[in-house]
Amino acid sequence: MIPPHRCLTDPLLQGSWPGYLPPMPKRARRMRLTTWRSPVTAVIAALLAAFLTPAAAHGAPRESAPVYSYENAIRESVWVDTRLDGDGDGKTDRVAVDVVRPRELARQGRKIPVIMDASPYYSCCGRGNESQKKTYDANGDVVRMPLFYDNYFVPRGYAFVGVDLAGTNRSDGCVDVGGRSDIQSAKAVIDWLNGRAHGYTSRTGTARAKATWTNGRTGMIGKSWDGTVANGVAATGVKGLKTIVPISAISSWYDYYFAKGAPLYDSGPDWLSDYVDSPDARTKCAAVQRKLVDEAPRTGDWTSLWTERDYVKDASKVRASVFLVHGMQDLNVRAKNFGQWWSALAKNGVERKIWLSQTGHVDPFDFRRTAWVDTLHRWFDHELLGYDNGVDREPTADIERHPDQWVTSTLWPPRGTDAVTLRPGTGTQAGVGTLGLRTGSGTETFTDDPRLSETDWAAHIDESTASKAGFVTAPLAGDVRLSGSSKVTVTATPTTSTAHLSAVLVDLGPDTIRDYADGGEGITTLTDRTCWGASTAGDSACFKNTRATTAAVDYTVLSRGWADLGNHASARKGVPLTPGKAYTITLDLAATDHVVPKGHRLALIVAGTDKDLIDPPSSTPTLTLDLARTSARVPLVGGAAAFTRATAQSGTAADATVLDGVREPHTAHRVPGGGL
């Protein structure tokens, strides 16, 4: 996804920002493929085809091997009937499906599983860190498929399918940004793969194309909008979809654009649709565009458009397993999206696995490449080929604790995690209060200043400033781990009829983190390449390497949330405020997993507009907080007892050179926004 306010020449849009939207036992590392020798491959494939079956003579296989020719793979295009007429031309829409599959297995008549990425980006904007687009030969068959999935998995006996969402590239129809058209575009392809929908050899012809070569077992994968479509398709409960791997994906489109009425971006889904529409769609889809404007009001009120695009409510329908990946500092598809989806899947007993990085909106191929390819390979082998390789018995969560340093968690959140109510209290100076378990009293007052952001507030946490109210623990005597989603309830009295609120949790103390606010959102792209699969002249499996981009910081914003105070009575509808009247509202903070170390302090900051992350209200309110009716519900591993132990006695400050836990912000840590 691209935030609508980003300049299209921004280098972020050239790569990591799409759409302009127990560890395994030690074993020998398999070699990366840097060359491909077709004759040798053919011999190996023939031998294996003759002697190996899914249950080999010496035991069931644990890993698919690269024994099929990628160079000689079948490459074909099919158009699948979605049974919708989104563009209103009187004909049902067909979506383009580009297929790459092993020729040897086709000759043997063996049915194979499918890995599928359904995307709106294949022609407009490209995929991956190098913004790769599909290319075609003179017959219209795909030559280059973006990313490494086909290069790596086709030689291992999978088919790879790249689907152009309706209204994009070579597909009919209109882009409706996560609605029925988007989801049906991909669902129809799974139906076709399972013999329940019609496919054709051309966009307008009548010659049928049947997917007789597949067993219908499908895994969907994708980052951002692509992963969002995977979430949406899984929420239909479609048969044949066995697993999804959503990366930095949306679970409810309302939560991409709004936070309890507060606008996160300065435009709506119509902008995104227009950006990815094909030229044909632009001439036919005015009605769809108008609906995206009219039914997504800038007031932030919930409408039926958002209900249609809320996949969380349908988590009970999910049949597929879910391997979820998200950056905890993703300020594009914000972390609330993965938190609420994960919780809903857990409540419905869905098999699931999660990776949480310190990055922003970045693919794991670009922040943990070797481990990612290995884990994804084993995941698909287990879920689609049925191999008992132990991936389902590994810890549920991998969490990046420091740049390139990962820990695991058997469950996520860990067993013994409880929501603990932390309460603010007044301190020795205005706006600089305490944070603990006891109910506070008194008030704190601040005035919204849209020129300032969460980093400005954190940098001045120990100063009395007009723009925020800060509440801080003493230096901790032991580590405190937050794992999951927090909620902050505030009771505030505004001076105007409109007001926006922000609440952030901050780890105060020096650290080295991935620089998620840098242009690469935590990675730097290098010039050298490594290869992950087989290549052809038109489709290289070799991709630019990356390294972690780090920053030495004096505070880390670890979770954040926002709301329009006018939505105090309903998360779905705002009303004008009465100046001088107190209102209570709860802000949903993003899911995270973060350890506040011994010697650091934990802070809660409540303020108005968070520059670059929400839009300001129409007025400039001053708000007075009633501290007795303000609190934070924070998921702590070990619960209240862990917090009590960590705060029972003063810890030693982590760095004697730090002024009250924060250095002077002469190099302010930037927040991704319009000017970057």
Swiss-Prot record:
It catalyses: Hydrolyzes Xaa-Pro-|- bonds to release unblocked, N-terminal dipeptides from substrates including Ala-Pro-|-p-nitroanilide and (sequentially) Tyr-Pro-|-Phe-Pro-|-Gly-Pro-|-Ile. It comes from the Bacteria. Keywords: Aminopeptidase, Hydrolase, Protease, Serine protease. The active site is at S224 (charge relay system), D330 (charge relay system), H361 (charge relay system). SMART domains: PepX_C (SM00939). The keyword Zinc does not apply. InterPro entries: AB_hydrolase_fold, Galactose-bd-like_sf, Xaa-Pro-like_dom, Xaa-Pro_dipept_C. Residues 423-450 are annotated as: Disordered. GO terms for molecular function: aminopeptidase activity; dipeptidyl-peptidase activity; serine-type peptidase activity. GO terms for biological process: proteolysis. This is Putative Xaa-Pro dipeptidyl-peptidase. It comes from Streptomyces avermitilis (strain ATCC 31267 / DSM 46492 / JCM 5070 / NBRC 14893 / NCIMB 12804 / NRRL 8165 / MA-4680). The lineage of its organism: Bacteria, Bacillati, Actinomycetota, Actinomycetes, Kitasatosporales.
